[in-house]
Amino acid sequence: MVSPATTATMSAWQVRRPGPMDTGPLERVTTRVPRPAPSELLVAVHACGVCRTDLHVTEGDLPVHRERVIPGHEVVGEVIEVGSAVGAAAGGEFDRGDRVGIAWLRHTCGVCKYCRRGSENLCPQSRYTGWDADGGYAEFTTVPAAFAHHLPSGYSDSELAPLLCAGIIGYRSLLRTELPPGGRLGLYGFGGSAHITAQVALAQGAEIHVMTRGARARKLALQLGAASAQDAADRPPVPLDAAILFAPVGDLVLPALEALDRGGILAIAGIHLTDIPDLNYQQHLFQERQIRSVTSNTRADARAFFDFAAQHHIEVTTPEYPLGQADRALGDLSAGRIAGAAVLLI
């Protein structure tokens, strides 16, 4: 694809005014194609996943970091322009025509104690795609080359898009649980991230139990190999060695902790969670049960997950929408009408 002229325009969606989806917070606009900085790539977007974090940004669950931001941080596209300093800035060379991925994390300082010890996801100066900077609900976007991702082969653009956040954050969440080999893992909520994480855990020999509100999601869980699937607040049939809470519902923390066996760990995968009810120490935490949060991801997480995905083909269920229906896609996600991980095609 030829790089667009500096005066070229594109179609995109912006968060006009954060609020519930039925108030029309998204607005479709025609705006200038962004220009890449010397350390950036200009990318023609081919597919962009529709993530629950996009919903949190759009509905105002998260504070506004950029007025009228273009959401979207699970971006797959084609490099059409390479900044003059990219060779020095990137961990690997990028050329025009390369397929590239753009994820949530797009900037860290590189010098703080967190960056130096390999925990760049905790960097106080971190910046995020589709929140601090414009994302992929558009025909074109930019990304710092140092935070662009080479992608595994064997996947379509649509299949790859959810791997860039739903996949990576699920992979990190699974690591945070310290699930023992052959252990029993509970998944609370079964949307885009959980249905990918389940396959990762199954490939590692885990036994999966799913608690989720949607009948279609429960059906998908069983099709993918879960040992059981029940309603969101139901108790699994066996004690769990670990659990991951994907649903942004604080009320589920207590039943998840109660389902843990001694020494079990509950990882909370989301960036936003409603209030957690009062805990009872003896009932919910004693016997060395733990709660752990999960904050973003590192580039090392992404590389490890993509290596895993290249070896174990993940079956990504991707209801597809055209770019012009981004508002409908987010509305369907909000209403629980999506099984799997929705993707916008551009």
Curated annotation (Swiss-Prot):
Binding residues annotated for Zn(2+) 1, in chain numbering: C51, H73, C165
Cofactors named for this entry: Zn(2+)
One MF annotation (Gene Ontology) recorded for this entry: zinc ion binding
Annotated EC: 1.1.1.1
Keywords noted in UniProt: Acetylation, Metal-binding, NAD, Oxidoreductase, Zinc
Catalytic activity annotation: a primary alcohol + NAD(+) = an aldehyde + NADH + H(+); a secondary alcohol + NAD(+) = a ketone + NADH + H(+)
Residues the entry annotates as binding Zn(2+) 2: C109, C112, C115, C123
Record Pfam families: ADH_N
Top EC class of this enzyme: oxidoreductase
InterPro entries according to UniProt: ADH-like_N, ADH_Zn_CS, ADH_Zn_typ-2, GroES-like_sf, NAD(P)-bd_dom_sf
Cofactor binding: number and manner: Binds 2 Zn(2+) ions per subunit.
Disulfide bond keyword on record: no
Modified sites of kind N-acetylvaline: V2
Highest rank taxon of the organism: Bacteria
Similarity-based family: Belongs to the zinc-containing alcohol dehydrogenase family.
Misc. remarks from the entry: Was identified as a high-confidence drug target.
NCBIfam families, per the entry: adh_fam_2
Protein name listed in UniProt: Probable alcohol dehydrogenase AdhA
Gene behind this protein: adhA
